[in-house]
């Protein structure tokens, strides 16, 4: 197959690692090619079907291994649904992470894609951080898969308890505004949440976790995501529209839990307990960007702390993209996993599709492979010429 030959011929990376213990280059970009993974909300029924049909030798054993590791037929749930069961946090999150790694395995095993040679840095949006750490070699796939499953069960229980105690719905809502209004919108939100106190959380000691709202994600130059009680979120929107001079477009997200908010404290505590140094390899094959610092993890303890805090802290996605784009010299961006949300967020920020030696690609179904590998090969040659 000509496409497989193209994959095997894929050139080695251009540029050198430059993050603590990695050699740097003064003449070439240091983190030129980024591999990124999607987060919660991209799950859909049947999202493995085309992959199994196109690449049964790789995908069938991979999905069987997933079921064995989790001791449940998650592959059947992904294929057949029902979707309301797949959407449960404890199912959606391991499904998304596993499918993301499966697609990467297809590239490696069917097309000879050499991740360690072709990629300089990995990152993932929220849940996607786990796939990024697996791809870079910090966590093993079996450990990460079970970790995500258990974490998802705890997160689901956190939300159920909050609903029972308050009688309210919990979830996440994106606020979209003009780029030049984002800073003042964030300031207005923070002022409402914490009465001017520094930070994105409502830090009032008199407010229970279920009454709090957090800025869960800073996604782009014109979008943040709020997480928590929908009643409290609606009150916040009324306040900033009446008194803050803002009227952002509000979009409820495909999430039945308030991720990255104080109600997820039990998930943070679980992560701190089970994510021990012996389960983390450091250094690994390449840097991975932390969601909570928007910089590469610097040590085992930094990784353990950052990955644990991710459950309750803001995901600094926009800052991560800006760091790689403006400071680390990243010009090529490869998204791997279900859905196109991650690619759209990256494309909106870096706008590199037409730049010589740069571009943004994503692989979410088999038809994406050929144009992606060709684009990566072409831009590697352009940069070398």
Each model region followed by its residue ranges:
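A generic secondary-structure signal
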Residues: 106-110, 239, 323, 327
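N-terminal chloroplast transit peptides
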Residues: 1-18
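A short, flexible low-complexity segment enriched in Lys/Arg and Gly/Pro that occurs
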Residues: 13-21, 98-102, 310-317
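Alpha/beta catalytic cores of group-transfer enzymes, especially the acyltransferase/condensing modules
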Residues: 41-42, 136-310
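Glycine/serine-rich loop-strand microenvironments at binding/catalytic pocket rims
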Residues: 1, 175, 179, 217, ...
